[in-house]
């Protein structure tokens, strides 16, 4: 298999000129829980392994267990081959196969849309769910939605609409399709057709060093680059309490001055939306953005009539210990996008949520006015059924004792959010991590660590060296479900 793969396959995100040896090809036989069963290429005793795999390789085995360190590119939240997800996929495949979705409905898609809009991250602001296939596509849809709203709201002439730009943050990444790339700066992920459309602020970032939390402020905002060094993590994420601080004023002045220069005079930029990855820039380097700065950006965008898009493909659905960052930021978007852990990592699926105002911007008497975006497998039953099963497991997980205990270690009581009762224990205004505060404190004091940071299931750290290197670890959620899995 390795030789045949090297001769035939074109991998994503791989420089093939650097892969010349068959030993560099990872042959995965199967996967279970958080591990792969991998062909080791030789008959020799495999090292001891404490994994959930039912068959542990012994002497002379060709297989060995390998930890899925990337969580299969950030999608695995419940472990490989989770029985509930596998059965959900089989059930939908046997009942539906694939059926068309335009002007039709089926139970898995309807249930998914209703729970995300009415009882999920869209509660309180969203009215519609547009189901697609992956995060990049979901962001393309979000951009089309928001820019249509802006075009109508500002009366932008049709010939000028192709010039509309977006506001965002440097280091953002929204996918590999052309429109999603154009919503970002020029970078390693862009291509020959890329045309950056917009303006991107340098984001203030949060880190922990020697047990102390600091906010690294860009020089364009303030000369003192660590204005709030030493503040507790709970204070940094208490956005409402920080809105009247000197730093908030500095952020507002910087944002408003920049926008005034950008949108006035000759060569002014027509802006159409604010596009944010809330709290953490994932592919851009696991940058934990100061939430106060993002809130100031949101407020400034709202004041100028710009629709707000939250790209929650990476951060949404409890990755950061909360259902959605909206509860922490104290602000809702007009459009938001969910993918990756939406299906527990089993199959691809994305959902773009939109407010009623956004939906109404596409109403009319001709088809040309509709949102003409879709693909053959839009809202395919297998994906929707698996997503519902994954969400069922998440709802159970966040009410479990292990989840509450992890929160309690960080001083969060586990009952938060604005609506207690049906949403109790799902949203929280407190910040916490599955890694203990003591572990983070020790990690941040190591000589080899430049800084560390954690939130929810994400732990990121920078290593000292010639160039800054970043490591990221994603804690699997399946251990929180272990008792339920046995029942």
Region roles according to the model:
Residues 1-487:
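Conserved N-terminal phosphate-binding loop of PLP-dependent enzymes in the Aspartate aminotransferase
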